[in-house]
């Protein structure tokens, strides 16, 4: 494919923005190529500025569950924007959106809208600390919860340790209040609570990890977290920014039948516009200002465009939508399994609803340590060929693929064929 216009655009961008992008993964560094600059999308397809067409499995990193430029969503947005983009005062649509979220998400009795997933997790941690009067948060290695200081933490040595900053600019004092253990390791969680339990305000977890690839919880893991946090008076916080309305009609918590105290949302609930939300038990949420003493505010929180995008996205999703995702996922998994076996390349495939992840290794992936063993050089080579074959994948081994209601069986078969062609070229 011809990428000449994208190459020129990136050459200009590196002098205008750090790394030439506004979010690091968009730089395509892990696949050793210049980023592809996109121009438009429709349905399951996305088109770059050179005119190349791709079947899109990035979907703006998850929000576009109805595909690109859904007619109902864009029609509602066109109407809404003519009424004004933001008012700094409540709107009736905020009520309708809140009612819809409360109806669909089992844990949420009250909800606060914000403007990003990072803002949602940041506020949820502040609320957990304010509600419990405790300081420490336990998170899992490889689970990404946005770029707030207390969550940009990785583990030191040992099973359960005080965290170390994962980015320059994160104070050590902040890191010391974050405990990190391996995802899916309930024994490590128990040990952490034995050591620090009197001061752990909450456990934050992606019910399906989505930023080390796609890594579902092992049997009993989420149930164990629910039991341990309840026993110690800590809050269980589900970060469903990615999994919310992607894993199931009632989010991951409905799918797995484990109800947290607080839930963070984003991505799908904005229909492609900037948005976030956090909610949970009424007695906890009433600690948020102006009802309570825990402060949180935002100029664009609940803005009418994001609420419009979210409301008209969620309104179109039905339980049957998720049956369709499962059908397409079954087809893709079977096809990839056959293709990689044909080429004698090891592959592990993980799925959760409309999220699919594959790893180029033989061992079943249950945490970041195992995910890191994937063949990154092979992934990078394959990525380039997949793009040349008209398939747009996330440009990182540690990001999952997303399906939309607009993907078709034909799209899936073309994708399977593209993997076959790509492996034929590079092996």
UniProtKB/Swiss-Prot annotation:
Chain segments annotated as transmembrane: none
Disulphide connectivity of cysteines: none
Keywords: Cytoplasm, Isomerase, Porphyrin biosynthesis, Pyridoxal phosphate
InterPro entries for the chain: 4pyrrol_synth_GluAld_NH2Trfase, Aminotrans_3, Aminotrans_3_PPA_site, PyrdxlP-dep_Trfase, PyrdxlP-dep_Trfase_major, PyrdxlP-dep_Trfase_small
Location relative to the cell: Cytoplasm
Cofactors named for this entry: pyridoxal 5'-phosphate
Modified residues (N6-(pyridoxal phosphate)lysine): 267
A single cellular component GO annotation: cytoplasm
Main location: cytoplasm
Leading EC class: isomerase
MF terms in GO: glutamate-1-semialdehyde 2,1-aminomutase activity; pyridoxal phosphate binding; transaminase activity
Pathway in which this enzyme or protein is active: Porphyrin-containing compound metabolism; protoporphyrin-IX biosynthesis; 5-aminolevulinate from L-glutamyl-tRNA(Glu): step 2/2
Enzyme Commission identifier(s): 5.4.3.8
Pfam family, any one: Aminotran_3
Coiled coil: none
One BP annotation, GO: protoporphyrinogen IX biosynthetic process
SUPFAM superfamilies: PLP-dependent transferases
Subunit organization: Homodimer.
Similarity comment: Belongs to the class-III pyridoxal-phosphate-dependent aminotransferase family. HemL subfamily.
Matches recorded under PANTHER family: GLUTAMATE-1-SEMIALDEHYDE 2,1-AMINOMUTASE, GLUTAMATE-1-SEMIALDEHYDE 2,1-AMINOMUTASE 1, CHLOROPLASTIC-RELATED
Name under which the protein is recorded: Glutamate-1-semialdehyde 2,1-aminomutase 1
Organism of origin: Macrococcus caseolyticus (strain JCSC5402) (Macrococcoides caseolyticum)
Highest classification ranks of the organism: Bacteria, Bacillati, Bacillota, Bacilli, Bacillales
Gene (UniProt): hemL1
